[in-house]
């Protein structure tokens, strides 16, 4: 006669019924609970998998897979001919007993911590760029189209990187990045930007922010003044400030950074941070005259130029300027770019091009920090570039992005008073809609969210320049119908209140 099942076998079903399609995970969590609370004690025998499957109405395979996982973790042990037993000594995290309770921080202690917090963190907000498990909604900016990415081709490149003969992809990589990706990046920059740089000048990093942080560590000292376009990427100025640098926001007009005003307040900065090819979030392209002023200022002050390039591969017609790195002050230019916009965000690969004389310094510091980007994605990306797949993808996406830009322009055209001004849209996948008084961009963004539309507040992209007020609208990741529907909500909100009436809460 079969031995009766212990009570916990039925209790776990009552406590938390199995979820369809998640049988293996449910079994694992159920066994984990009874182990933690002591209902299944060390040294006790587990009922046969067949009987558990019958009692729980689950496939036998789900029981076996969950038990295999617990055996791999040292929780269960198999005795030949006698089934599975709970280990006599459980791993520390699986020991029985009540769940640990984290004592709340007393309010007074929390206040002291906040008082000690550096002023450099004032205004910092937890990143809301991605909400786990939820796709972005139109018109959120900073999101590329991933639905049209050639995933099958990318899988083949990844598979090649993990082939048996490529076991090196499982090891640590060189701090400056794999030679294959640095060579591919140098060729890519020649084709897309007209740059002339060697593979040795390329440092592979995980993001443009990591590149900026590395520049600060290698070239700048605490207290050095850094002039930055204002507004800019919301994290850039804050990151530089966290490096104990004196960060000064510089306004700009339709020609680019206001060099005259910047020189009056900061005649000799240590570095100038800007996006001359296509400024985010405003979309402004620095004019040739303003570029000459900028180079004169940098030359006179011997300032480093941190030239950041977001998605300049996506140009919507017209002549594309060469980077400042191609000009007469190339020995003072640090060029920063990323693959996340042209590939997909999860790839987490970007690049930094440094002057030849600084290669050893940057590689050494990155090595000392223990930084390196994962090898396999680098090898896969190098193959993806060299085989022409990235070029093919870019050609297709330029057409898609241009069409979506046109949809946004048409959807807004003539539907708002002239006081609502749409910024230039010559490249990239976002636009800036400047708002007149008395509208508040933060309040508008909140109201749009209640209508199911996402947008960014221009004022939250600022550092020290007052009066920024606008909406940062993304269009790259959304179908035409989604863009049109979102604009309808935006127009209904903005056109529904006359200038001078109270703004929406």
Kindly label every feature range from the protein language model.
Residues 1-159, 357, 363, 367-374, ...:
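N-terminal basic, amphipathic alpha-helical segments
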Residues 157-301, 313-331, 401, 498, ...:
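Conserved core of the PLP fold type I
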Residues 460-466:
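AMP-binding (ANL) adenylation modules
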Residues 185, 351, 379-387:
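Helix-loop "lid/cap" segments that line or gate small-molecule binding pockets
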Residues 326-361, 373-376:
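Active-site PLP attachment segment
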Residues 76, 225, 246, 304, ...:
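Residue-level detector of anion-binding/catalytic polar loops
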């Amino acid at each position: 006669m079969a031995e009766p099942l212990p009570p916990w076998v039925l209790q776990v079903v009552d406590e938390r019924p199995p979820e369809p399609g998640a049988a293996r995970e449910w079994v694992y969590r159920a066994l984990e609970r009874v182990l933690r609370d002591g209902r299944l004690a060390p040294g006790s025998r587990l009922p046969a998998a067949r009987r558990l499957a019958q009692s729980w109405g689950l496939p036998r395979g789900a029981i076996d897979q969950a038990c295999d996982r617990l055996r791999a973790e040292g929780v269960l042990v198999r005795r030949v001919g006698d089934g599975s037993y709970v280990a006599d000594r459980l791993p520390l995290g699986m020991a029985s007993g009540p769940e640990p309770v984290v004592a709340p921080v007393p309010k007074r202690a929390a206040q002291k911590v906040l008082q000690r917090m550096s002023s450099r963190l004032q205004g910092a907000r937890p990143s809301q760029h991605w909400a786990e498990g939820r796709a972005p909604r139109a018109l959120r900016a900073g999101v590329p189209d991933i639905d049209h990415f050639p995933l099958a081709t990318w899988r083949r490149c990844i598979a090649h990187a993990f082939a048996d003969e490529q076991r090196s992809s499982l090891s640590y990589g060189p701090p400056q990045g794999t030679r294959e990706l640095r060579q591919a990046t140098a060729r890519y920059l020649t084709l897309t930007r007209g740059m002339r740089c060697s593979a040795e000048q390329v440092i592979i990093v995980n993001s443009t922010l990591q590149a900026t942080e590395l520049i600060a560590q290698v070239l700048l000292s605490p207290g050095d003044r850094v002039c930055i376009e204002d507004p800019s990427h919301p994290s850039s100025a804050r990151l530089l400030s966290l490096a104990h640098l004196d960060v000064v926001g510089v306004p700009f007009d339709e020609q680019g950074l206001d060099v005259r005003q910047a020189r009056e307040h900061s005649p000799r900065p240590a570095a100038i941070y800007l996006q001359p090819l296509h400024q985010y979030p405003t979309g402004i392209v620095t004019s040739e005259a303003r570029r000459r002023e900028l180079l004169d200022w940098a030359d006179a002050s011997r300032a480093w130029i941190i030239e950041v390039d977001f998605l300049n591969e996506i140009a919507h017609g017209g002549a594309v300027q060469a980077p400042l790195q191609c000009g007469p002050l190339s020995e003072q230019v640090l060029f920063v770019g990323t693959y996340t916009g042209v590939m997909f965000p999860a790839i987490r690969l970007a690049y930094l091009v440094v002057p030849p004389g600084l290669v050893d310094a940057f590689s050494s510091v990155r090595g000392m920090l223990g930084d390196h980007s994962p090898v396999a994605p680098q090898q896969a990306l190098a193959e993806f570039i060299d085989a022409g797949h990235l070029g093919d993808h870019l050609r297709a996406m330029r057409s898609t992005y241009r069409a979506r830009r046109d949809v946004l322009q048409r959807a807004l055209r003539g539907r708002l008073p002239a006081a609502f001004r749409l910024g230039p849209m010559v490249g990239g996948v976002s636009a800036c809609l400047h708002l007149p008084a008395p509208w508040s961009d933060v309040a508008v963004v909140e109201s749009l969210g209640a209508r199911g539309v996402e947008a960014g507040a221009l004022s939250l992209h600022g550092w020290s320049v007052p009066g920024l007020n606008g909406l940062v609208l993304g269009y790259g990741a959304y179908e035409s119908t989604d863009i049109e529907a979102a604009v309808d909500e935006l127009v209904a909100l903005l056109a529904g209140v006359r200038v001078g009436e109270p703004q929406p809460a």
